[in-house]
């Protein structure tokens, strides 16, 4: 995978900011950022297009959206995070890392103005069917969903009528959906 020259420097800056915020706001339990970065990047090996608009639902502490935005730096990222301390953190990170390709929406996605995404990502937010439901209006049949799942990914999609694939790496299941009907 071709990474931008400044990728690991930006990741180091992110890690410093995360540790500072985490002392006060308890955003995440992760102590070592490298496995999180690798987990965030892994599905890009299987993504066969360069999305113009990417939506990340329940962005939390920025996994995977911040790292994906560093790599897919010509894509426009919309991060939806309703918890104030997390959305504030994401906005601060965006400014500190000079990420001009991200917009943080401090709201639940279902409360926001609809935009069509080429790619919708989410990591450990909710069950697949619920996530699809709350994203209604943000996708069409050409949108790809990339969902970072653990166990049970296969059961979650058993009733879906769309193209799907699951790529496993360790305990992580990367779920790709395409052709989800609105």
UniProtKB/Swiss-Prot annotation:
It catalyses: guanosine(527) in 16S rRNA + S-adenosyl-L-methionine = N(7)-methylguanosine(527) in 16S rRNA + S-adenosyl-L-homocysteine. It comes from the Bacteria. Transmembrane segments: none annotated. Its EC number is 2.1.1.170. GO terms for molecular function: rRNA (guanine-N7-)-methyltransferase activity. GO terms for cellular component: cytosol. It is found in: Cytoplasm. S-adenosyl-L-methionine binds at residues 58, 63, 109-110, 123. The keyword Ligase does not apply. Pfam families: GidB. The keyword Aminoacyl-tRNA synthetase does not apply. Keywords: Cytoplasm, Methyltransferase, rRNA processing, S-adenosyl-L-methionine, Transferase. It is an enzyme of class 2 (transferase). Specifically methylates the N7 position of guanine in position 527 of 16S rRNA. PANTHER family: S-ADENOSYL-L-METHIONINE-DEPENDENT METHYLTRANSFERASES SUPERFAMILY PROTEIN. Belongs to the methyltransferase superfamily. RNA methyltransferase RsmG family. This is Ribosomal RNA small subunit methyltransferase G. The lineage of its organism: Bacteria, Pseudomonadati, Campylobacterota, Epsilonproteobacteria, Campylobacterales.
């Amino acid at each position: 995978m071709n990474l931008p020259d400044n990728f690991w420097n930006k990741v180091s800056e992110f890690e410093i900011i995360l540790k500072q915020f985490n002392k006060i706001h308890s955003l995440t339990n992760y102590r070592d950022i490298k496995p999180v970065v690798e987990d965030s990047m892994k599905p890009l090996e299987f993504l066969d297009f360069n999305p113009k608009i990417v939506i990340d639902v329940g962005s939390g502490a920025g996994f995977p959206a911040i790292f994906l935005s560093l790599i897919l730096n010509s894509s426009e990222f919309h991060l939806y995070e309703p918890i104030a301390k997390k959305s504030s953190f994401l906005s601060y990170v965006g400014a500190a890392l000079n990420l001009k390709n991200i917009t943080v929406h401090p709201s639940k996605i279902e409360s926001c103005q609809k935009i069509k995404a080429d790619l919708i990502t989410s990591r450990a937010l909710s069950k697949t069917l619920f996530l699809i439901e709350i994203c209604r209006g943000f996708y069409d049949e050409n949108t790809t969903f990339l969902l970072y799942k653990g166990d049970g990914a296969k059961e979650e999609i058993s009733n879906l009528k769309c193209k799907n694939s699951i790529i496993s790496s360790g305990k992580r299941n990367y779920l790709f959906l395409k052709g989800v009907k609105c």
